Amino acid sequence: FTHGGHPYTFGPRHFLTKDEKLFGFLNEYVPMRQIPEHEFLTYIERDQRFYHFPIHRDEVSEMPDAEQIESELEACPDEVSPENLEQFWVQSVGPTLYDKFINSYSKKMWQIESNTELTEFGYTAKGVALKTGPNKACWNEAISAFPVAQNGYDDYFDVSTAETTVHLSTRIEKVDVDKSRALIDGEWRDYDILINTVSPEFILNGAFGPLRWMGRDFFKIVLPVPEVFPENVYFLYYANQEPFTRIVEYKKFYRYESPMTLIGLEIPSNRNKLYPFTTKKDYAKAKLYHDALPENVFSIGRAASYRYLDVAPIIQQSMDMRAELEVGRVRPAA
C-alpha cells in the first residue's frame, strides 16, 4: 500500500530465517536487502527511558533498580522449565525485568488478565531472553532482510501464480471440503486440491466453535521530518499503560526518499483476526479443525495454520506441500 506516497504494509513484514537456502530462494525472485543492524527499543515509563529489546545485559547497570535486578539474575536457574509465559520470563530474567518489559505489554497485546494463560511462547524472546555482547541488533543469530523494491513482496505473487489462472474480485460463497469443491457465482467448481489461507473455522462452518484471535487497529501518521527514529532502530515498543503496543517507521525498511516520514501505530483490537492465541487450549481446538480436513486440503499461512508464522515459514509450508504432491503422498480428490 501507499499513504501520501509512502509505501507501507499492514504491520511490518520483514523476512526472518535461519535457513540460507530459503533466503536464497526468495532472493532469486524478490531481491532482498539484508538488514543485520535491525534494532528494537522498548520504552519503560517508570525508568523514563528506552532500552533495547531483547533485554540487553549491559543495560541493566543503567537501570535505577539495577541492584535488585542483579540479585534476581543471580538467582535465576541455569535451565528453565516454565509452564506458561510468566514463568518463562521470571525464571529467565527475574521478576523485576519481567515486570518492566513483559508483564503489561503481553497483557495489553493479548487483552488478557494474566500471562499465565499463555502456554505456548517460543516466539516471545526475539531469539534470546537476555542478550549479551557488543551487538545490540535483534536478529544477529538469523538472517533479517526486506525486499529492495518499493512494492515489497508483490513480485513474488506474480512469480508464484505465473502458471495458474487467477480470478480476481471473486467471492467464494461456500466450500465443500469433502467433495473438494467451491461455490462461486452460484456454480459449484471442482478441484483436485484445496489450499486454504483463512481460518479453518470458516471453511468448516464453525463446526467446533470459534477460534480466539487478536487483531490490530492500524493508524498511519505522516510527520514533517525526513526521519524520526534513531539510526538502526526500526520498531519502538511500549510496555506500559498506553493503549498502543508498537510504532514502526516504514522508511527504515523501504529506504525511499522523502522530506517526510510515515509511522504506523498499532493498537490491539477485536476488529480483525491477525494473531492466533498461543495457548494449548486454543491450539487443541484448532487441531480439531485441521484433523477434520481431508488430506487434499492444505492449510497454508498464519490464519489457516493457526500458528504465529511469518513470511519465511509460510514459504516453507508451500515448498513442503509441493514436495508431498510430487511424491504422491497426497492423492488429489477423485
Predicted regions located by residue number:
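Active-site/ligand-binding neighborhood in enzyme catalytic cores
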Residues: R49, S61-R181, G186-D190, L204
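Conserved flavin/dinucleotide-binding core of flavoenzymes
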Residues: I55, R246-A334
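Short catalytic/ligand-binding loop motif for oxyanion handling, primarily in non-cytosolic enzymes
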Residues: T42-I44, Y51-F53, Y98, K108-S114, ...
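Structural/interface elements that position substrates and couple domains in central-metabolism enzymes
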Residues: G24-E28, F88, L97, E231-Y237, ...
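Dinucleotide-binding Rossmann-like beta1-alpha1 core, especially the glycine-rich loop
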Residues: G4-D78
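A short acidic, glycine-rich active-site loop
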Residues: F10-R13, F146-P147, K220
